[in-house]
């Protein structure tokens, strides 16, 4: 709820209209909550579960060891690697080419990490993993706990309107459940979109398929 309030304050200052609210995973819950409190044209919730129950192991990792938490999310969240490596700009070099590789060691701007199993995989995951960087240790822990505790009121669920839901058929973290109470007012043919052969991070795994779905939704 506090995250929703912050977004509302920002939107009030910006004085925007004809808003389309969107969020992925935890951010999708914020967008959903916001959609019941702030005027909008449409809300798009990507890869959300409700209730979004986060396991104790992940919560413990997020509190004490962010690397372990991110590894957990990568292990269960990713179904496939993108065919084309995502290019990012950083430290004056494009892509992940700035890495140094030798005998399983990966040298990144954040230090040297030894990866015994698959250093190439670690390199390909870098553009996604860098999204989880945080300035304070507790950020991920707080966010994940808020997922577990988040609930909409009954009247909010009944009043959900013009909400589009995007799921991925190989997502182990936020599975599509046609019986979910959030989908009571949804038209399952027009409001629910399912990406094929994709896990929890479609913008990383299959951006082309995601773009096609976006075009269907927004056209």
Language-model regions: role of each:
Residues 159-198:
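Conserved loop-alpha-helix segment in the C-terminal half of the alpha/beta-hydrolase fold
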Residues 60-158:
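Conserved alpha/beta-hydrolase catalytic His-Asp/Glu region
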Residues 1-22, 208, 212:
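Active-site loop/oxyanion-hole signature of alpha/beta-hydrolase fold enzymes
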Residues 2, 135, 174, 205:
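Residue-level signal for the nucleotide or nucleotide-sugar donor/cofactor binding architecture
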Residues 16-54:
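Conserved hydrolase catalytic core segment
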Residues 188-219:
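Catalytic active-site module of serine/aspartate enzymes centered on a nucleophile-bearing elbow/loop
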Residues 3-4, 66, 203:
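Conserved donor sugar-nucleotide recognition element shared by glycan-biosynthetic enzymes
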Residues 49-58, 70, 80-81, 173:
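A short beta-to-alpha transition loop/helix N-cap that caps and shapes the active-site region
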């Amino acid at each position: 709820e506090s995250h929703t309030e912050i977004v509302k304050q920002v939107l009030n200052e910006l004085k925007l209209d004809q808003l389309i609210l969107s969020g992925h995973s935890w951010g999708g819950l914020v967008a959903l909550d916001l959609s019941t409190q702030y005027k909008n044209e449409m809300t798009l919730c990507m890869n959300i579960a409700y209730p979004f129950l986060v396991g104790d192991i992940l919560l413990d990792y997020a509190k004490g060891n962010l690397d372990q938490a991110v590894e957990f999310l990568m292990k269960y969240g990713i179904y496939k690697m993108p065919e084309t490596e995502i290019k990012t700009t950083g430290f004056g070099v494009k892509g992940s080419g700035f890495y140094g590789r030798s005998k399983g060691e990966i040298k990144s701007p954040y230090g040297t990490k030894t990866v015994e199993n698959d250093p190439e995989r670690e390199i390909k995951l870098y553009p996604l993993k860098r999204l989880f960087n945080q300035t304070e240790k507790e950020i991920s822990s707080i966010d994940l706990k808020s997922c577990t505790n988040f609930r909409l009121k009954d009247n909010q669920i009944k009043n959900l309107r013009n909400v589009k839901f995007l799921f991925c058929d190989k997502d182990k973290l936020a599975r599509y459940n046609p019986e979910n109470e959030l989908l009571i007012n949804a038209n399952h043919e027009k409001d629910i979109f399912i990406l094929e052969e994709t896990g929890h991070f479609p913008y990383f795994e299959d951006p082309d398929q995601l773009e096609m779905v976006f075009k269907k939704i927004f056209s």
